[in-house]
């Protein structure tokens, strides 16, 4: 399909400052046109066909796996990311710098390598998997493996968004809480968590979108069984392999729409949780 | 030993070390119930550490701390029933003024009505009625510190501790808040200890001043006692401007001041300047004149080269019509010297 843009007048662009012009052109080329093209491609089909492709049982199951596990991975990292960030900001220990740079490793590692490594370590015979297998839990090539890969690749986000907020916290506010009779747990829930919550949510949102889009590591550690541990991005890839471009773009569009809705919700939560910065 | 109920705070032989730094050393201190005491000293003198030890925010290496007669040495901060106010307010930024003040009350599981009533009472006490729904970021520094004070007072502490409470405020607000704190204390009567490095602040607000230096108490007394009868050279020079002269100085020869101690301390306002030679004066020359507002500072050079700083009221300065390079005669009205075993 050829994409014909209506002949628009671009004189308005010349009235903008340079920074604005660059922003518009850059975002148009990188973001807007590709996204619009995706939707147009899907929209070129009849409505009934779109609905049919979007709601076919194998796709619906894949959405559930993708979004369910992505949210779970993001939430897990929300909890453990705060704990890791806490350790990094509140304690001094030898090798702290090295430990700190290790956190970013999931960003630097090619995702296929990550998937392969996790699949090896967590397989029935792997270093860690062999201890879990006797309990009847298989990690590699199941949903647990998918979750594990998603947790791995989205690990750094919450740590990095929460760290600066923890550094900003006044230790004195915690001392004040204690002097007013708060126990350590009351101090955490009432004094420490609320100010870092916007950062936690921002990190969770980033981790979530990263997990939804993840392909390379999951395709390796997953069994890729439809209705079981097949995720939507892998399903899209399979559709493409079968030259089913329509199916691939429709599923892709659904993925995008869902992600947008969830990100809006998390953003709204984030705004609400930082309402006091007046 | 039995402790007197009327004693609000008793600190007994308390020491605290941070690494190799001895922050507080063998300090004894008694604060009467209902009094307002200032811990005064330069930075690093241990005054803030002593306050934090009393609060339980630090643990002493040795010694005991008694609050209203009970041994509180091993009690945690949350059990000590103290109110603590920090230099930088330490308000909960995500909570409104009302919620900040209610913090301690809500932890104590009071009924909603009771909390609301108490919060309104405190807002009125700290003159912030109507600002209860604001967030700390929407308040000025002075207002924030008053919220911090209300928050600390809300739980009716037995002891109120303030760590440089006005240190982060600008000069005008600081002065206002000072006299306000004094008035507030006269209303509330809670045993209060506040830390300051500003001797004027200590003089204005406190019933008793504890002067600290190098982790030790130099002197305890009323503002007048501290000023008129400083116990050590440190107190003498910390509590106000002072000239330090050798006892061999020219100026003491005419007056017949005789002291075995090698150093003599002389307040600038205790130096009399005259145009004509009168008995017991020595000649000197004006080096410089500095206008300090209600006082004028004259720097005078004695014949032995020693430069003295003298303060005189504006009227006196006008009468004398002093000019730089002018020949004058000076006389110490009052001087003080201390036994040798001290260090500044």
UniProtKB/Swiss-Prot annotation, chain A:
Transmembrane annotation, as ranges: 22-42, 67-87, 102-122, 139-159, 188-208, 217-237, 246-266
Compartment list: Cell inner membrane
GO molecular function terms attached to this record: ABC-type sulfate transporter activity
GO cellular component: plasma membrane
Main localization of the protein described in the UniProt heading: membrane
Source taxon at top rank: Bacteria
The keyword Flavoprotein is annotated on this UniProt entry: no
Induction: By sulfur deprivation.
Gene3D superfamilies: MetI-like
Residue ranges of domain ABC transmembrane type-1 in the record: 63-266
InterPro entries: CysT_permease, MetI-like, MetI-like_sf, Sulph_transpt2
Family annotation (Pfam families): BPD_transp_1
UniProt keyword list: Cell inner membrane, Cell membrane, Membrane, Stress response, Sulfate transport, Transmembrane, Transmembrane helix, Transport
Membrane topology of this protein: Multi-pass membrane protein
Matching NCBIfam families: 3a0106s02, permease_CysT
UniProt record similarity statement: Belongs to the binding-protein-dependent transport system permease family. CysTW subfamily.
Quaternary structure (record): The complex is composed of two ATP-binding proteins (CysA), two transmembrane proteins (CysT and CysW) and a solute-binding protein (CysP).
PANTHER family assigned to the protein according to its UniProt record, in alphabetical order: SULFATE TRANSPORT SYSTEM PERMEASE PROTEIN, SULFATE TRANSPORT SYSTEM PERMEASE PROTEIN CYST
The protein's role, per its UniProt record: Part of the ABC transporter complex CysAWTP (TC 3.A.1.6.1) involved in sulfate/thiosulfate import. Probably responsible for the translocation of the substrate across the membrane.
Protein name: Sulfate transport system permease protein CysT
Source organism (scientific name): Synechococcus elongatus (strain ATCC 33912 / PCC 7942 / FACHB-805)
Organismal lineage: Bacteria, Bacillati, Cyanobacteriota, Cyanophyceae, Synechococcales
UniProtKB/Swiss-Prot annotation, chain B:
Subunit structure: The complex is composed of two ATP-binding proteins (CysA), two transmembrane proteins (CysT and CysW) and a solute-binding protein (CysP).
Source organism of the structure: Synechococcus elongatus (strain ATCC 33912 / PCC 7942 / FACHB-805)
Organism ancestry: Bacteria, Bacillati, Cyanobacteriota, Cyanophyceae, Synechococcales
Keywords from the UniProt entry: ATP-binding, Cell inner membrane, Cell membrane, Membrane, Nucleotide-binding, Stress response, Sulfate transport, Translocase, Transport
Protein name per its UniProtKB record: Sulfate/thiosulfate import ATP-binding protein CysA
EC supergroup of this enzyme: translocase
Ranges for domain ABC transporter: 9-239
Function description: Part of the ABC transporter complex CysAWTP involved in sulfate/thiosulfate import. Responsible for energy coupling to the transport system.
Gene3D superfamilies: P-loop containing nucleotide triphosphate hydrolases
InterPro entries referenced in this protein's UniProt entry, alphabetically: AAA+_ATPase, ABC_SmlMolc_Importer, ABC_transporter-like_ATP-bd, ABC_transporter-like_CS, Mo/tungstate-bd_C_term_dom, P-loop_NTPase, Sulph_transpt1, Transp-assoc_OB_typ1
UniProt-annotated binding residues for ATP: 41-48
Induction trigger: By sulfur deprivation.
